[in-house]
Amino acid sequence: MNLMKGGKADVAFVVDPDVDRLAMICEDGVMYGEEYTLVTVADYVLKHTPGNTVSNLSSTRALRDVTRKYGMEYNASAVGEVNVVTKMKATNAVIGGEGNGGVIYPASHYGRDALVGIALFLSHLAHEGKKVSELRATYPPYFIAKNRVDLTPEIDVDAILAKVKDIYKNEEINDIDGVKIDFADKWVHLRKSNTEPII
């Protein structure tokens, strides 16, 4: 990131080893935010191809906001690429993915693909004529904290989640994967890990 501060590059792309997740670094060395990878490319896609969008429940609300800006429908899926793809097919989504930098663009294929994400991001950047940091500033500035709670065998997680649902029954609740509570200006998502004893 310090290399970016020298002013010789407009953007840096960071991918994982199997190139299915994408993060960016702005020209000033600040992380763009992997939660905003999908949001940004969806903005570009929706500008040129009206349609629905999908992300998993744990992703930023910003995709919903951008989708509604175009008068389209946002849908949430359970966490996991296969769940996102299933919901995308069911809702004829034109773009989808996850807040971990995963972009799924059906016009290319139904799989997370960082190279497709890079191409869409660069196209959007060129059309907007902005610096990367300026483009990032155009999206809702949601703060996301991802915390984990280690569980012990005697903890009844399902009972805890049921109690949370009951306490917040007057709020918008989605329980397709744990419990997500949507408030007017924030949200919280509690879910059990499928691979570790954590929430």
Regions found by a protein language model. Give the residues of each.
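Short, acidic/small-residue loops that bind anionic groups at enzyme active sites
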Residues: 31-48, 52, 78-80
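Phosphate-binding and adjacent anionic-ligand microenvironments
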Residues: 11, 49-198
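Short secondary-structure boundary/capping elements
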Residues: 5, 33-37, 182
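Short, contiguous, pocket-lining structural segments
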Residues: 14-16, 30, 37, 58-59
